[in-house]
Amino acid sequence: MPAQLQTELIRNAPATSIQFEIEPAHNALYSMMLLNVADQLSGLDEWVTRTAQSLSPERRHNNRLVLEGLHYAVTPIRSWNSFEAYLDDLAASDPTELRDRLLERLTTSKVYDLPRGVRPIPSIPPQQLLDKATYMNWLAEKFAGDYDPEIESEAHDYFVEPARMHALIIYHLQTMWREYLRVEWRRVLPMLEEAVTVFRAQDWSKLNALQVARQVTNQELKPYWEGMIERAQHITLIPSAHLGPYLGKFSHDDSLWLLFGAHLPGGARATSSALTRSELLVRLSALNDDTRLQILELLGQRDELCAQDIITLLDISQPAASRHLKQLSATGYVTERRRDANKCYALNRERLDETCDLLHRFLKI
């Protein structure tokens, strides 16, 4: 596409609409997705770690198969008033149409790599992926090892038989909702409703979409997130009870659903203590570990340390260092920047002060 036409599309694109919603379907599905990474991310809500540990091997496997291998067949492409309504619609959907939607999403370009207003086109005719060898080779090229061949191979066995795929998806999601998430959803719903009410009450009119996202998430966003936010024409910001300090997303066409850990916006007051407790638990969880405290202690003594310096000084493995630094960075206790090929970190004293202030306000001392 000529550069001039791309410029025109960007200039003529409508302004971004931003709203705060609970989004039960997106919220519940993402909580189920977190069960697949409970052993990789520290700082997730206790429900996630406890539920992940309680799953049988078969259910744990099926959770990955449905929410990773068949992900785009279950991704909501619109808002739903309840998870049950989403499930009913999914159950009534044509299995072949679901499969074709999965293949179309898989083969289209990453939308955040494209100018705003430009629709992605398939990188390969979707129907070619019905051949397993073609599918597995294409995955190896596209994801460069960042996928599970066993899960993807089994997913392929299902989506070449759409009715079988559909039956697995419906059975698994209905079971997970009924046995694990329905009671938990009722418990956290009042807190999520309060979060949405408080965020809606703030004045966001003078900020662009990227500025709103930074303030809501309380994070300096990486280019990956910035690209998606700047391209989206409809952004729905969704508080999650289970996400901890991390971010999550769903996208479809020009719509982006961005999930963040439920908390209060700066300066706002909660009408109940649940929302403040939730935010405190996320912040204090990052401090409730000897290795993470040692990392903060080191950064308090020096202006900046790179990841390899921390690994050497604390004699810890690279995966352990990465996991701890990811949580500290997401919580805001450290700032991250690139120095050549290295990730380097500095202490964010302001965030530590904010945590102390939040604890004082909560305890009323």
What is each residue range found by the language model?
Residues M1-I229:
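N-terminal, charged low-complexity regulatory/assembly segments
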